[in-house]
Amino acid sequence: MVDNRRTFTAPQSLLETNLTFPNDEPSLTTITVTRERCVDPSLIDSFLRFLRHGSDDIIRQKLNNYRKGSINGKNKCKEFLKQELYPNWQIRNNIISFCEKEAAEMKNETDQQCGNNKKTTAEPLIDARIDPYAARERAEKQEAQYKDWTKVTEWVANNRKIEQILTSTTEGILRQNCEQNNDYLKEFTQFCKDNS
């Protein structure tokens, strides 16, 4: 197992907002993501919540703030997208992708440990008349070995769905407040290609 880790920092625009947090709950502005954090994602979930709140949850307020300082509405939207929203989405996407890659590596490692590759021979099946619990024990053993992988893949799928819902909702708000004919999700994909 390779010790993979990536550090992510919240966009500067989130760090300078007028949002205040109680003293007993410091805001999480930087996170180092590892396989262990993907398996137990409570800290990652907090960081993603912070990022989501700082952009998608308060998008109307953010757009209003940009509107005050800009004469041209299209420029305020472009500025908001490039400086705040798209970098935020990209960080969230990168965190989820990191855990997705870790899950794939976990599956490969577990397959090799369990001998589930088609190239290796599986342990012999025991006749149910000799040991009636053998099949169940074998299934439980395999399930236990794949538990962490299953947990991470379910977390990734759940967060991909959350991101899909948030980005489509945000795109609707952007179409109402900015340019109706823009495809903001395609623009985000291009933004990621340009900034990777």
Curated annotation (Swiss-Prot):
Pfam families according to UniProt: MIX23
This protein's GO CC annotations: cytoplasm; mitochondrial intermembrane space; mitochondrion
InterPro entries, per the entry: MIX23 (IPR019171), MIX23_fungal (IPR016805)
Result after altering C192S: Loss of MIA40-dependent import into the mitochondrial intermembrane space
Keyword tags: Mitochondrion, Protein transport, Transport
Effect of C178S: Loss of MIA40-dependent import into the mitochondrial intermembrane space
Span(s) of short sequence motif Cx13C motif: 178-192
BP terms from Gene Ontology: positive regulation of protein targeting to mitochondrion; protein transport
Location of the protein in the cell: Mitochondrion intermembrane space
Residue interval(s) of motif Cx14C motif: 99-114
Annotated consequence of substituting C99S: Loss of MIA40-dependent import into the mitochondrial intermembrane space
Induction annotation: Up-regulated by RPN4 transcription factor upon mitochondrial protein-induced stress conditions such as the accumulation in the cytosol of non-imported mitochondrial precursors.
Superkingdom assignment: Eukaryota
Protein purpose: Regulator of the mitochondrial protein import machinery that is localized in the mitochondrial intermembrane space (IMS) and facilitates the transport of proteins from the cytosol into the mitochondrial matrix. Not essential for mitochondrial protein import but induced and required when mitochondrial import is compromised. Stimulates or stabilizes the translocation into the mitochondria of proteins such as OXA1, ATP1 and COX12.
Family: Belongs to the MIX23 family.
Any further remark recorded for this protein: Present with 768 molecules/cell in log phase SD medium.
Domain notes: The Cx14C/Cx13C motifs are involved in the recognition by the mitochondrial MIA40-ERV1 disulfide relay system and the subsequent transfer of disulfide bonds by dithiol/disulfide exchange reactions to the newly imported protein.
Name of protein: Mitochondrial intermembrane space cysteine motif-containing protein MIX23
